[in-house]
Amino acid sequence: MKKILSAFVIIIACSFGLHAQQPEGKFFKSFDGTKIYYEVKGEGYPVILVHGFTGTSQGWKHGSLYPALLTAGYKVVILDQRGNGLSDKPHTDAGYANDAEAKDIMGLVSSLSFKNYDVVGYSRGSIITSRLIVLDKRIHKAVMGGMGADYTNPQWPRRIHAYKALMGDTTMHDVDDMMVWIRKNNFDNLALAYQQKHQPSTSKKELAAVKIPVLLIDGTEDTTNGDVTDLQKLIPGSKMVSVPGNHNTAGNTVQFASAIIDFLK
């Protein structure tokens, strides 16, 4: 348990890294007035990439998937989820509750006039992707990377421990590494705490009703978020692919990109 939890900090910060960000895109005003930073590149069928905890849109540019999608002719949309990067960082419960992050993406899709789209999430981005495939009928195909079934538990211990630590509880030693990383990089602790407090869970009943094609993809050495085979059992017809690497490295691999390109065809 401690080993798994201590890896929390690196869930996305390393695999879809923490990178200095210069604005090259635009801002979208979401349903509650929160400004969401995004970039669009390419001319083909739209694919939205959803980063994970402490990540930003720019992390995707340092892996294999982003350039592979552009080369394959897709229109690629990357965004900073609220509380991250160049997007606004609300310090209220309302700023993150009730699927706010999924609503941001759905609103962005509407503003871009996409009739349909595919979505790829990694780690916490897969948790948001899970909400999208339940809430948004415009999704054609979805990919969830680096995620097992643990997030379906509303009382997921790791989420609760992370929230408490971010709020100042110094007894949550299983997330000490996470807190060191956050302090080192001067992240907005309160915004991150609200993200953990209101991190959505998707019920097994909701997942059982999913009708679209879903690809589950993880690293051969990744045990960070539970067993992906357990999640596959919950989503009818979902496919599962394993690629080399652990939670921090699998999402950057050529094999990760190739599996997704093949699935989206």
Region locations from a protein language model:
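Short beta-strand element of the alpha/beta-hydrolase
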Residues: 45-52
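The serine-hydrolase catalytic nucleophile loop
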Residues: 54-66
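Conserved alpha/beta-hydrolase
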Residues: 69-88
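Flexible "cap/lid" loop of the alpha/beta hydrolase fold
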Residues: 127-134, 138, 142-169
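Short beta-strand/loop motif that positions the catalytic acidic residue
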Residues: 210, 216-218
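Conserved loop-alpha-helix segment in the C-terminal half of the alpha/beta-hydrolase fold
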Residues: 220-245
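Catalytic active-site module of serine/aspartate enzymes centered on a nucleophile-bearing elbow/loop
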Residues: 243-265
